[in-house]
C-alpha cells in the first residue's frame, strides 16, 4: 500500500499482523507474500486453518527445492482447498478498475466458486484451469525472462531483438513446463503469454526495470540500491531454477 501513491484504504479493510485474526472465521485467505517468507508464515497459520480456502497470489518458487507455493503449503497443511491466481495486471490497475484478465488454477470446484465470487466483477475476468502447477510456474518464470528483456531494453537494442527473445523464451518455457508436470497449453493463458507480454514490456514491472538498469550500464551502487528497496522475484526464481537444471542436467538456454 505504501508504494501506491495517494491511495487510501477503504474503511472495510483492516491492517493487522495478528495471524489468528487473519485466519479465524474466514471463507477465503489470499496469500500474497514473498516466497522466501512463505514457509514461516504458513507454519504460523497452520493452527488456525480448518475449512478455509487458500488462494495464492505469490509468484515464485522455494529456494533450493524449486517447490511451488501450493506444494509448500500442502506439505504443512492437509488441504485440497487451494488455488493459484496469476496474470497480466498491476495493483494500480486493479485499484483503477481497468479491464484485466487472470488465470485461476485449482482442482477444487468449491474453491473455484469461492474465488470467483470474491474476484469476478465488471472489470476482472477469470479463466479457470486445473493446471495449478502451470499457473504458478508461468507466474514465476516470467519474472526471470523480464529481467533479460529489461537488459535488452537497457542496451537500446531494437524492438525486433526483444520480440525474438520473448518468442524464443516462450518455446523454452513450454519445454520447462512439461518437465515440471504442467500443461503446455497453460503457456497460452493469462498466466503465461499474457503476463509474460506485460512484464517484459512495461516500465511498471520491477523485474523489467531492474534488468534495464543492468543493461544501461548503471553504476553498481544504483543497481544495488534498487535491488534492496524493491522485491525482485525473478532473482530468487533464477537461482532456484538454475540449480534445478544443473542437478537434473537439463539444458535451459533462457536461464543460462
Predicted segments, located by residue:
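Rossmann-like NAD(P)(H) cofactor-binding subdomain of soluble oxidoreductases
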Residues: 9-10, 16-24, 28-99, 115-117
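Alpha-helix C-terminal capping/helix-to-coil transition sites in glycosyltransferase folds
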Residues: 24-25, 141, 193
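Short, well-ordered beta-strand core segments
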Residues: 29, 54, 102-103, 125, ...
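NAD(P)-dependent Rossmann-like dehydrogenase/reductase catalytic/cofactor-binding core
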Residues: 149-153, 178-188, 192-256
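Internal alpha-helical scaffold of NAD(P)-dependent oxidoreductase catalytic cores
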Residues: 37, 48, 75-80, 99-185
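Electropositive phosphate-/nucleotide-binding environments in soluble metabolic enzymes
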Residues: 16, 32-35, 39, 48, ...
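Glycine-rich phosphate-binding loop and adjoining beta1-alpha1-beta2 segment
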Residues: 1-8
Amino acid at each position: 500500500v505504501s508504494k501506491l501513491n495517494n491511495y487510501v484504504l477503504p474503511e472495510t479493510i483492516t491492517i493487522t499482523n495478528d495471524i489468528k485474526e487473519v485466519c479465524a472465521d474466514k471463507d477465503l485467505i489470499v496469500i500474497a507474500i514473498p516466497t522466501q517468507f512463505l514457509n514461516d508464515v504458513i507454519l504460523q497459520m497452520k493452527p488456525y486453518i480448518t475449512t478455509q480456502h487458500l488462494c495464492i497470489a505469490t509468484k515464485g518458487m522455494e529456494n533450493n527445492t524449486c517447490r511451488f507455493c501450493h506444494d509448500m503449503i500442502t506439505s504443512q497443511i492437509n488441504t485440497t482447498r487451494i488455488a493459484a491466481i496469476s496474470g497480466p495486471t498491476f495493483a494500480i490497475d486493479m485499484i483503477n478498475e481497468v479491464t484485466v484478465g487472470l488465470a485461476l488454477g485449482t482442482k477444487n470446484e468449491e474453491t473455484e466458486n469461492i474465488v470467483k465470487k470474491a474476484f469476478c466483477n465488471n472489470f476482472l475476468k477469470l479463466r479457470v484451469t486445473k493446471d495449478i502447477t502451470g499457473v504458478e510456474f508461468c507466474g514465476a518464470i516470467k519474472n526471470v525472462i523480464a529481467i533479460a528483456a529489461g537488459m535488452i531494453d537497457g542496451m537500446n537494442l531494437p524492438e525486433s531483438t526483444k520480440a525474438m527473445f520473448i518468442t524464443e523464451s516462450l518455446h523454452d518455457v513450454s519445454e520447462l513446463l512439461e518437465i515440471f508436470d504442467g500443461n503446455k497449453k497453460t503457456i497460452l493463458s493469462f498466466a503465461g503469454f499474457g503476463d509474460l507480454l506485460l512484464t517484459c514490456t512495461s516500465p511498471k514491472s520491477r523485474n523489467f526495470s531492474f534488468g534495464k538498469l543492468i543493461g544501461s550500464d548503471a553504476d553498481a551502487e544504483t543497481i544495488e540500491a534498487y535491488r534492496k528497496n524493491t522485491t525482485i522475484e525473478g532473482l530468487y526464481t533464477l537461482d532456484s531454477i538454475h540449480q534445478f537444471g544443473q542437478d537434473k542436467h537439463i539444458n535451459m538456454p533462457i536461464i543460462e
